[in-house]
């Protein structure tokens, strides 16, 4: 019996969630509560719609030409895709049979290391790992949970030599300070599997979703970081031998 997945939506020709042109599936459900989340409507684990791997593959193969020509592929995003690891594993297996590159965009909040996680990673070409904040106290205030599980997953990926791009959102007043950047650099310094760090400037593009759901957007008034701030954080991380982009 095939596993059923629950998704929020998909994007057929994404260009910012992995290399090349990508088919991105936004999976429903997330256990983090990031104050800056721009997909607030993906949190509910019972929301979205049910799909099968076959449903997704019918869509994916339609865009195979664009993916192949650009060095692209598929990306499992969210919400948090790893909450549906069994389904994502099956979807990625189907993609690999078609020669399609696979990317897992995750916050790394892994609750249990069972064989499914390893089976998923075996068919994952790239993991884009969101490291929100290395200071656990700030992390808990920013996203609602400890960073312990995410950092353990980062170490797990390093030990298995899984190719990783780290994503770090630069939020003024929360993650734009020198200490936070140095902590990130120190943590990842010896992780040879990390190809690069992507700095993502904070934005308010998802604010309207919070408002539509009748909820307070607690970062209201926080402005995107200035270019000088991004350059400063980039410079600190480069001191640790990383390729850094924004």
Curated annotation (Swiss-Prot):
<comment type="function">
    <text>Activation of pyruvate formate-lyase 1 under anaerobic conditions by generation of an organic free radical, using S-adenosylmethionine and reduced flavodoxin as cosubstrates to produce 5'-deoxy-adenosine.</text>
</comment>
<feature type="binding site">
    <location>
        <position position="79"/>
    </location>
    <ligand>
        <name>S-adenosyl-L-methionine</name>
    </ligand>
</feature>
<keyword id="KW-0004">4Fe-4S</keyword>
<keyword id="KW-0949">S-adenosyl-L-methionine</keyword>
<dbReference type="GO" id="GO:0006006">
    <property type="term" value="P:glucose metabolic process"/>
</dbReference>
<dbReference type="GO" id="GO:0030955">
    <property type="term" value="F:potassium ion binding"/>
</dbReference>
<dbReference type="GO" id="GO:0005829">
    <property type="term" value="C:cytosol"/>
</dbReference>
<feature type="domain" description="Radical SAM core">
    <location>
        <begin position="16"/>
        <end position="239"/>
    </location>
</feature>
<dbReference type="InterPro" id="IPR001989">
    <property type="entry name" value="Radical_activat_CS"/>
</dbReference>
<keyword id="KW-0479">Metal-binding</keyword>
<feature type="binding site">
    <location>
        <begin position="130"/>
        <end position="132"/>
    </location>
    <ligand>
        <name>S-adenosyl-L-methionine</name>
    </ligand>
</feature>
<feature type="binding site">
    <location>
        <begin position="36"/>
        <end position="38"/>
    </location>
    <ligand>
        <name>S-adenosyl-L-methionine</name>
    </ligand>
</feature>
<keyword id="KW-0411">Iron-sulfur</keyword>
<keyword id="KW-0560">Oxidoreductase</keyword>
<dbReference type="Pfam" id="PF13353">
    <property type="entry name" value="Fer4_12"/>
</dbReference>
<keyword id="KW-0408">Iron</keyword>
<feature type="binding site">
    <location>
        <position position="30"/>
    </location>
    <ligand>
        <name>[4Fe-4S] cluster</name>
    </ligand>
</feature>
<keyword id="KW-0963">Cytoplasm</keyword>
<dbReference type="GO" id="GO:0051604">
    <property type="term" value="P:protein maturation"/>
</dbReference>
<protein>
    <recommendedName>
        <fullName>Pyruvate formate-lyase 1-activating enzyme</fullName>
        <ecNumber>1.97.1.4</ecNumber>
    </recommendedName>
</protein>
<feature type="binding site">
    <location>
        <position position="34"/>
    </location>
    <ligand>
        <name>[4Fe-4S] cluster</name>
    </ligand>
</feature>
<comment type="similarity">
    <text>Belongs to the organic radical-activating enzymes family.</text>
</comment>
<dbReference type="Pfam" id="PF04055">
    <property type="entry name" value="Radical_SAM"/>
</dbReference>
<dbReference type="GO" id="GO:0006974">
    <property type="term" value="P:DNA damage response"/>
</dbReference>
<dbReference type="InterPro" id="IPR013785">
    <property type="entry name" value="Aldolase_TIM"/>
</dbReference>
<dbReference type="GO" id="GO:0051539">
    <property type="term" value="F:4 iron, 4 sulfur cluster binding"/>
</dbReference>
<comment type="subunit">
    <text>Monomer.</text>
</comment>
<dbReference type="GO" id="GO:0016491">
    <property type="term" value="F:oxidoreductase activity"/>
</dbReference>
<dbReference type="InterPro" id="IPR007197">
    <property type="entry name" value="rSAM"/>
</dbReference>
<dbReference type="InterPro" id="IPR034465">
    <property type="entry name" value="Pyruvate_for-lyase_activase"/>
</dbReference>
<keyword id="KW-0119">Carbohydrate metabolism</keyword>
<feature type="binding site">
    <location>
        <position position="37"/>
    </location>
    <ligand>
        <name>[4Fe-4S] cluster</name>
    </ligand>
</feature>
<keyword id="KW-0313">Glucose metabolism</keyword>
<dbReference type="GO" id="GO:0043365">
    <property type="term" value="F:[formate-C-acetyltransferase]-activating enzyme activity"/>
</dbReference>
<dbReference type="InterPro" id="IPR034457">
    <property type="entry name" value="Organic_radical-activating"/>
</dbReference>
<feature type="binding site">
    <location>
        <position position="203"/>
    </location>
    <ligand>
        <name>S-adenosyl-L-methionine</name>
    </ligand>
</feature>
<dbReference type="InterPro" id="IPR012838">
    <property type="entry name" value="PFL1_activating"/>
</dbReference>
<dbReference type="InterPro" id="IPR012839">
    <property type="entry name" value="Organic_radical_activase"/>
</dbReference>
